[in-house]
Amino acid sequence: MTRTVKKWSARDAAKCIITPSDLDHKYSRGVLGLITGSAQFPGAAVLTTAAASATGVGMVRFHSSSGLAHLVLHTTPSAVVQPGKVAAWLVGSGIDAKKYSDFTTWLRHRWFKLVRLQSVPTILDAGALSLAGSLEQPTVITPHSGELATLLSARGVKVSAEAIEGDPKKWVQNAADTLGVTVLLKGSTTYVANDEVLIQLPVATPWLATAGSGDVLAGILGALVATNAIEILNDYNQLAYVAASAAFIQNQAAVRASDGAPINAEAIIASIPATLAKLLKR
């Protein structure tokens, strides 16, 4: 189904930033569970956790090996490394897609059973993209063109990364229809779609093309999904709005950090709070 394109703005993004009241506490402000990072990509665990924490979630629960937990705690000592109730899940950043290639292989993952037991809104990134359409809860996936080409081809829709890059608006809608999930297709112009909504983000700063920026986006998105979890469960399209807002915030944080110069993922994270403050003042 072809949708009308909605161009996302700062005003739209600000609506997805939940500000706490005097009655809030860390649990009511949203708890994000993360299953991210690996021995091959330990930085993903650090970056997703730090980005989520900087975006204003009430608590981050990190689930992985003790070695990765020590790395995470060195950068984000406020992270909790014990399992417990969460409002949203972020799964897959920095995890090998070849090792966990489908639902059956994910069933062998130590922590995946918690994702199934706590059926809350879930973000699937990188190594968890193969789970798209397999979970009962509201789900958003965050592929780039190559990952989406692999995912769609595995589902019988043969397409190349080059074809997706040539017409991302078409293929993000195709993916949403084929997979039955909300899709955030990363690129110089990012698109978000479900089977009703199509959102176009402003062109991103080229400095955002740096290692770890996808992990930062995943962390921002995880925090926003956790803080908007009730709204997402009550409004089908809210997950798409939150996904678009995460991409908007990431780009604005990158612009602020860069000021026309090169940046890294850590600099983007450091700029998130000031970026949120500016959006909330609009």
PLM ranges: what are they?
Residues M1-P121, S130-Q137, T150-R282:
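Small-residue (G/A/S/T)-rich helix-start motifs and N-terminal tracts that mark the onset
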Residues S64, L124, P143:
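A conserved hydrophobic position in a structured secondary element of the catalytic/binding core
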Residues P138-G146:
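Non-cysteine beta-strand/loop elements that form the S-adenosyl-L-methionine
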